[in-house]
Amino acid sequence: MGEVKEFKSFMKTVGGNEGNKCHYPTRLDTYGCGCTHDCKYCYAKSLLDFRNMWNPLNPSVADIEKIKRKIKKLPSDTPAIRLGGMTDCFQPIEKIHRVTYETIKALNKQKIPYLIVTKSAIVADDEYIEIMDKKLTHIQITVTTTDDERSKTYEKASLPSERIRAIEKLQALGFDVTLRLSPYIPEYVDLDILNNVKCDKILVEFLRVNSWIEKWFDIDYSEYTVKQNSYKHLPLEKKKEYISKITGFKEISVCEDETEAYEYWKNNFNPNKDDCCNLRIN
């Protein structure tokens, strides 16, 4: 690992189409400009790689003292802040720098709720369980495939089986935890495994296809016929068909970007029409 660079733009509120549809648009990234998970299809990577601003071997690290000062200025009624917007806040370098660990403690101190989004089983390590306040903590662990060997071909995160064990551990301990199936690629998911995960909640986000995505997944893209902006999506009826096969959870929500489908899931399907994340707010 080379010289550690400071990641300065650690907090932002997302606007545009995504921000308008997301109930929790404020993101706090403890690491940036690279992620050691280096998922080949990563949205952040696609934006930064061609500008030579993506360094998966040596991500930049946010200054925890600056983060603490920022958190202290937040109003007491701040909605949940998402930890891990552009990069994973529990990527392996967290074990070295512990910026996420200290950020969680700072958020707890100010009573600010937080939504952790990660592909890492580290979030379920005992040292993090000890500091996470169940009244403030919401956790989404992302799974893209149920096949450990397949996952190795496009991401360097914890194996799917490890993530599932982390989900089940956090569920058993009473945390507000969700399996985030994102992106949902039906060809990559064994429904018998998925539907037997011991977790109450699942959040599904279907694959959005552009020229970057088409490089990485060996699937039939001919079904992705609905175009919006620079992405192609599955038709709503096809999405409904795939969703109907997910049966092992008490609550299922869909995070959607395509406008017609967004309105359908919001008004006719999601348990909480105002919050597709379906967080358990105390």
Kindly give the residue locations of the regions a language model identified.
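Surface-exposed amphipathic alpha-helices with a cationic face
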Residues: 108, 129-133, 164-174, 244-251
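Structural preference for beta-strand elements that scaffold enzyme active sites
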Residues: 80-82, 113-115, 136-140, 176-180, ...
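Conserved Radical SAM active-site core
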Residues: 1-138, 146-148
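Auxiliary Fe-S-binding modules of radical SAM enzymes
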Residues: 2-6, 191-282
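Surface-exposed cleft-lining segments at the edges of enzyme active sites
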Residues: 86-92, 148-157, 175-178
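Active-site beta-loop-alpha junctions enriched in small/polar residues
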Residues: 86-88, 119-121, 142-146, 182-186, ...
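A general structural detector for well-ordered alpha-helical segments in enzyme core domains, enriched
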Residues: 67-70, 99-103, 128, 159-167, ...
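Conserved strand-turn element in the central/C-terminal portion of the radical SAM core barrel
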Residues: 156, 160, 166-189
